[in-house]
Swiss-Prot record:
Keywords, in A-Z order: Hypotensive agent, Metalloenzyme inhibitor, Metalloprotease inhibitor, Protease inhibitor, Pyrrolidone carboxylic acid, Secreted, Toxin
Primary role: This peptide both inhibits the activity of the angiotensin-converting enzyme (ACE) and enhances the action of bradykinin by inhibiting the peptidases that inactivate it. It acts as an indirect hypotensive agent.
Pyrrolidone carboxylic acid sites (modified residues): 1
UniProt-recorded name of the protein: Bradykinin-potentiating peptide 13b
GO biological-process terms attached to the record: regulation of blood pressure
Subcellular location: Secreted
Length: 13
């Protein structure tokens, strides 16, 4: 998962 701003390392979709 990814693409959404999260408090941590963002994983690209």
């Amino acid at each position: 998962q990814g693409g959404l701003p999260r408090p941590g390392p963002e994983i690209p979709p």
